[in-house]
Amino acid sequence: MSSSTATPLDNPPVLKLLNVESAYGPIKAIRGVSLQVRKGEIATVLGSNGAGKTTILKTISGILDPRKGSVAFKGLDITAKDPAFIVQQGLLHVPEGREVFPLLSVRDNLLMGAYTRRDRDGVARDMEMVYAYFPILKERSHQDAGLLSGGQQQMLAISRALMANPDLILLDEPSLG
C-alpha cells in the first residue's frame, strides 16, 4: 500500500532553531526558542510588542549572534555566521521599516536584490514577475524609491528580496506600510 502523504523524513526542515537565546547587552530578548520550517510551509511568529519576534529574525539572519542554541538552514549550521554568507545560502530577511535605497530608482532597487545572481535571463524574467505582482512598481520603475508611498516602499522591499530568488524569505512586519 502506498501513501501520498509526505513524512518529515521526506521533507526535512529547511530552517531549524534549537534552544536559541539572544540578548541586547545584559538584557535577554529571547530564550529557549526552538522551531522548524519545512519546504512549502508558511510559518508565523506571533506575539505582542517587545516579545522578541524581530530578535528571532535578526538572530536567524546573522544580524544578532545568539548566546546559546543553534540555527541551521538547509542542514548547514549558520549560527553566528556573517549575514552576507547567510544571504548567499538563499535566506533573505526583509526587515521592518520599508528598507529601500531612497535615492535609487525602483528598477535599480530591484536589481540590487539580484546582485548575487548570474543568470541574466532569470533576472529579467523575475523582474517581469515582480511587475506582474505589483504593477505600480512597473509604472514607477524610473522614479526614486524614496518618493514612493509607505505601502509602495514595502512592496519594493519584498520584491527586492524576491529578485534574489531565495529559498526562504523572513518578513518582519510585512503589512507595515
Language-model features: where?
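ABC-type ATPase nucleotide-binding domains, specifically the catalytic core motifs of the NBD
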Residues: 25, 43, 81, 106-125, ...
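The feature captures the beta-strand-to-loop junction immediately N-terminal to the Walker
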Residues: 46-48
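Helix-to-loop junction immediately C-terminal to a conserved catalytic motif
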Residues: 61
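Conserved ABC transporter NBD signature motif
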Residues: 69-76, 89, 123-127
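Conserved ABC ATPase signature
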Residues: 144-148
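ABC ATPase C-loop
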Residues: 161-162
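Conserved catalytic motifs of ABC-family nucleotide-binding domains
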Residues: 165
